[in-house]
Amino acid sequence: MKSLIFVLLLGAVFAEEDKIVGGYECTKHSQAHQVSLNSGYHFCGGSLVSKDWVVSAAHCYKSVLRVRLGEHHIRVNEGTEQYISSSSVIRHPNYSSYNINNDIMLIKLTKPATLNQYVHAVALPTECAADATMCTVSGWGNTMSSVADGDKLQCLSLPILSHADCANSYPGMITQSMFCAGYLEGGKDSCQGDSGGPVVCNGVLQGVVSWGYGCAERDHPGVYAKVCVLSGWVRDTMANY
């Protein structure tokens, strides 16, 4: 188990090895909900879900961090960025570091984000997305490519896989709070450094980049936290915290 999970968690340690595999450069600011979690370096992604709150993966937890919004080229100041520190970082109470179940956390910002054409929130789901729905995953994670400019936000279109295909890919490891997306033949996937980032389907945040076996490997699609199952906790926490 640890060897499987360790592959994705490398992104939180080796910040230079960051990007999406088999994707393309996102249209600039088309993913205006995408944020970078920073602790002196980019270590995970996240999604702005209101002017005060960001959703990310629980395995990306740090007690204090800085959220960078409005980014495209992560190493260049383009004049669109907002840098806001966290006031609270809250993991799902049933998150398990053993099997990465309920891999979601909320970050409350010390001040509201300014919403504009470069920074805006993504909607939370009111229902789960159907199998085969095409979604966009984005991030500054490992491209495993010498051609792709991974300092610029990368995007990838992926279909949601059936629970059966997901469970067959990872026997005994998939819970009701997880889903798989991608291609069983491999070649396209999220990777190290993308953890915590968004999976957006028809304008709705359906997934959080969580774990997988390697990156873009055959019969091992990416595994994502299933936001539609976890959104009750997200909404309750934002309302009551």
UniProtKB/Swiss-Prot annotation:
Residues 20-239 form the Peptidase S1 domain. The active site is at H59, D103, S195. One of its GO terms (biological process) is proteolysis. The record marks D189 as: Required for specificity. Keywords: Digestion, Disulfide bond, Hydrolase, Protease, Secreted, Serine protease, Signal, Zymogen. SUPFAM superfamilies: Trypsin-like serine proteases. This is Trypsin-1. It comes from Gadus morhua (Atlantic cod).
